Amino acid sequence: MINHKGTKCISTERITLRPFCYDDAENMFKNWVNDPEVTKYLSWTPHGNLNVTKECLDTWIKAYESDENYNWAITLKESPNEVIGSIGAVFIDNYLEQAHIGYCLSKKYWNKGIVSESLKEILSYLFQCGFTRIEAIHHVLNPASGQVMKKCGMKFEGILRKARKDNKGEFFDIAQYALLKTDLE
């Protein structure tokens, strides 16, 4: 059974994962949500202006009223007010005790282990909350995301053909990974 705790601050040696706040809008827009390269393999289009980002943030912040919301801002410890990415449970199935994880990071910070470090912490936290299975997917043309999942111990489960649409409305194949709580025992 899941004991929902919501989005709590989590820190490692290099990063802080924390709830988003309204002051994050400009850094979000500047660092990743308006970047076509960052959003290339995602289902949502780059934000066209700061107002789109503010509307997105408003929705996310209101969702924190529920303990069933898990959505973190990724920041470096040395600059906790500059949000460089996001990670969270984009879908939760309480009956099956499962969560689906999504993440996004400013390209300036790619290949530095930041998402892997963040994902490891989120996996641990969600299993502590009582989740049994945590899964993640990536566009097959984005193998770097799959490397993050593997690095965090997630197991490759297969390719789902034409299972999602990208931000241009085109169907694409996804690679699916998952980690079970029992995998850690």
Outline where the language-model segments fall.
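Acyl-donor (CoA/ACP) binding surface of acyl/acetyltransferases
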Residues: M1-N27, N31-E37, N71, T75-E185
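Hydrophobic residues in alpha-helical segments
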Residues: W32-V33, L42, Y64-E65
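Conserved GNAT-fold acetyl-CoA-binding loop/helix
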Residues: T39-T59
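Short, conserved alpha-helical segments within structured domains
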Residues: T45-N49, Y70, L141
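A short helix-loop-beta-strand connector motif used in the catalytic cores of GNAT acetyltransferases and
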Residues: T59-A73
